[in-house]
C-alpha cells in the first residue's frame, strides 16, 4: 500500500478494477489492516474478490532501499512479492518506493535465467503508438550486453502486450550513423545489428523519438531517466499551456482533448519491471486512481499473455547463443 496518498488512492483503484475489470480478477490489498479497512469501507461496498493481507511494516520513500528491504521483511512491498513467489498472487503492482520494489523483486523473485540486470521501462507517446524506453533509471553504468538484453526484454513485452508481431528496436544515440556515439553506443549498435532475432532499425536521435520510428528504444539508465524526467516536465508544461489557453478563450469544457490525453501518463498505467521471475508493475508515488487502475490492467494483460515465460525462454536462448560465440 505505497504511494503519496495511500491507502485511499490504491483502494479506490482496486475497487474500480474489480467493478469494471474481468470477472475472474481478484485483488489482495497488502498493508496495515487498521488503515486499509476504513479506506475500503469509505470507498464503497467491498466486493468478495477483495482481500486484505496484513503487512505491519512500511518502507518510506527516503529510506535506503536495500537496507530497508532487509530490515523490514513484513513491509507491504516484501509481503506482496512473497505472495507472488508462493503462488498466492500472479502479479504485483505498487506505487511505493521504486528502489525498494527493485531491491525486493531481486531478493524475493530473483532474476530470470540469462538476465544480468532487470530493467524498468517507461512509455513515451509518439505520433503512432507509444514507444517503450529501456532502461528508465534502474541501471546506470551499463555494458553493451546489458543493453542487448534490454532490447530482447522490450521486444517480447511489446509483442506479447501490444500485439506487434515484429517490434522495431532502436538505439538512442547522438546521430543516426552507426559509428556515432561513445564506445557503449558503438558496441551496442553492432550487437543489435548482428542479432537475427531483432528487427533493429538503427540509431534514433532524441528529436526523432516522437515520430514513432521504433517500438522499443534502448539506452543506459542514466540517459533514460534524464529523458523520462524531461518528458514528464515538458508534458506537464504543455498541458498547463493548453488549459490556460482554453480558459482565456472562455472554454468551459473540462474534458481533456486528444493532445492532453496523449501526454497524460495516467493513460499508460505503470512501468514494467522486466527480467525478474514475476510480473511487477511500478507506479508513480503521486499516481491518481486512474493510473493505478490502468497499471492493474497492464498486470492482468501480462499474466494472461504468459509474458514471464516468454521472457525467460528468449533470454535463456540469447545467453546460450552468447556462450557458444554466436553473438
Language model: regions and residue ranges:
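Phosphate/nucleotide-donor binding subsite
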Residues: 45-89
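Short beta-strand segments
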Residues: 29-31, 51-53, 94-96, 123-125, ...
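Short, glycine-rich nucleotide/cofactor-binding loops
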Residues: 1-8, 138-148, 282-289
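Glycine-rich phosphate/nucleotide-binding loop
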Residues: 106-133, 211-217, 221-327
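Glycine-rich phosphate/diphosphate-binding loop of Rossmann-like nucleotide-binding domains
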Residues: 8-9, 21-28, 33-37, 43, ...
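Solvent-exposed alpha-helices and their adjacent loops that cap or buttress functional pockets
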Residues: 19-22, 44-46, 69-73, 83-87, ...
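Short, conserved active-site loop motifs that form the nucleotide-linked donor/cofactor pocket
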Residues: 49-50, 131, 198
Amino acid at each position: 500500500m505505497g504511494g503519496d496518498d495511500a491507502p485511499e488512492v490504491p483502494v479506490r483503484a482496486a475497487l474500480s478494477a474489480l467493478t469494471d475489470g474481468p470477472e475472474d480478477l481478484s485483488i489482495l490489498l497488502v498493508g496495515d489492516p487498521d488503515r486499509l479497512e476504513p479506506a475500503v469501507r469509505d470507498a464503497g461496498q467491498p466486493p468478495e474478490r477483495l482481500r486484505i493481507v496484513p503487512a505491519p511494516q512500511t518502507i518510506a520513500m527516503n529510506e535506503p532501499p536495500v537496507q530497508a528491504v532487509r530490515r523490514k521483511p513484513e513491509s507491504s512491498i516484501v509481503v506482496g512479492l512473497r505472495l507472488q513467489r508462493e503462488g498466492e498472487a500472479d502479479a504485483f503492482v505498487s506505487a511505493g518506493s521504486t528502489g525498494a520494489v527493485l531491491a525486493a523483486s531481486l531478493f524475493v523473485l530473483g532474476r530470470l535465467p540469462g538476465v544480468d540486470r532487470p530493467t524498468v521501462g517507461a512509455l513515451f507517446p509518439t505520433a503512432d503508438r507509444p514507444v517503450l524506453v529501456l532502461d528508465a533509471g534502474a541501471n546506470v553504468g551499463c555494458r553493451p550486453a546489458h543493453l542487448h538484453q534490454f532490447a530482447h526484454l522490450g521486444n517480447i513485452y511489446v509483442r506479447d502486450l501490444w500485439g506487434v508481431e515484429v517490434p522495431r528496436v532502436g538505439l538512442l544515440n547522438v546521430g543516426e550513423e552507426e559509428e556515432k556515439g561513445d564506445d557503449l553506443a558503438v558496441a551496442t549498435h553492432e550487437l543489435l545489428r548482428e542479432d537475427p532475432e531483432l528487427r533493429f532499425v538503427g540509431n534514433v536521435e532524441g528529436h526523432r523519438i516522437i515520430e514513432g520510428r521504433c517500438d522499443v528504444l534502448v539506452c543506459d539508465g542514466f540517459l533514460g531517466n534524464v529523458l523520462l524526467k524531461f518528458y514528464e516536465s515538458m508534458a506537464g508544461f504543455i498541458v498547463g499551456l493548453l488549459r490556460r489557453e482554453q480558459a482565456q478563450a472562455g472554454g468551459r469544457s473540462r474534458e481533456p482533448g486528444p493532445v492532453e490525453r496523449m501526454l497524460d501518463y495516467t493513460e499508460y498505467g505503470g512501468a514494467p519491471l522486466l527480467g525478474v521471475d514475476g510480473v511487477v508493475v511500478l507506479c508513480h508515488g503521486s499516481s491518481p486512481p486512474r493510473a493505478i487502475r490502468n497499471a492493474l490492467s497492464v498486470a492482468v494483460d501480462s499474466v494472461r499473455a504468459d509474458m514471464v515465460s516468454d521472457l525467460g525462454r528468449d533470454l535463456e536462448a540469447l545467453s546460450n547463443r552468447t556462450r557458444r560465440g554466436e553473438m
